[in-house]
């Protein structure tokens, strides 16, 4: 992308916005940051800056639906996302991962495997490090492993990663996108501009994805945790790729739907000719980020898991399916358009009791009763919910307690991390708590 002499407005003064600003300056453009917040550092809040803009770069938190952005498009101004800008300024081989759930884990898995294989790899994007902060410093020998959210993808025009990974698509962020179709359209931009020289690794168990990818021009590489495919799959206790066993399941710390992340990562690694031995060792050594079904310790012999990252129904369901033995669940949070009826229709029989708390607790209880799930009670706080869950587990000899909210955190917390830390503190304050080593 030629930015020399161009007037570029960066919309958003956060991490990705500031990184985009620096990238534009490095590429010879005239950059200015705009932010709705008049107190934002290094930014103006005067909308007049958009009048003279040649290019408008949107941070992930900025929706395309703003009226003056629509007007900008009518005036033939280029309106793009930070991801599009970074991609246009890099020579690295791009591997992009999207999906409603599992993006961060899969991104980190692929990055870990490539590093284990001696390749120069960077995990970037929605995972925390803005792609634009390093895009122009990477060359053709580097791999940019990019976690791409729907927010980042919706502003892409020509983004075409060499390998795109589509993990799953379930309802999420509809308050931003408006409809499920628009959400899916944003996700589809991860492969829309790929060519016959590129690869699309996709979840063959997801019916919505099967419909989305019909027109994809890239090589389609399916994966499944249910049945064999001509890509990645699970068979006889192994993750396999095109008929070849790659790694034994008993050596990895993933279960249930979590295995989708592993199989997808194996597909990418095999497409890049990484040896099965290196893949197996890297996956066996891998530790997921905090608050993803994380064992934090035990109380009176009851194992306590913190899955605060579960911000939607399907991520919670994935955690439930991965639990060994009977368990009690604490769930609930901010009220959004979540289908809890679907949750109680699919929960494993090992789920013995649910304690709900948060803004949407009445919605959850109503769906539970409609599905004839009667072992459920409500709590006015996370502390009370923990006490009720422990009491049930002790009385009924359940050996596991899972905190997996299935909801956004914004009813009471800044984000899922703050919520996870709060749960950690409540657990640590319990009598007879023993921290996991």
Where are these predicted regions, by residue range?
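Flexible active-site lid/hinge loop adjacent to a nucleotide/diphosphate
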Residues: 138-222, 233-235, 246-254, 409-417
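Residue-level signal for inorganic ion chemistry
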Residues: 24, 56, 97, 126, ...
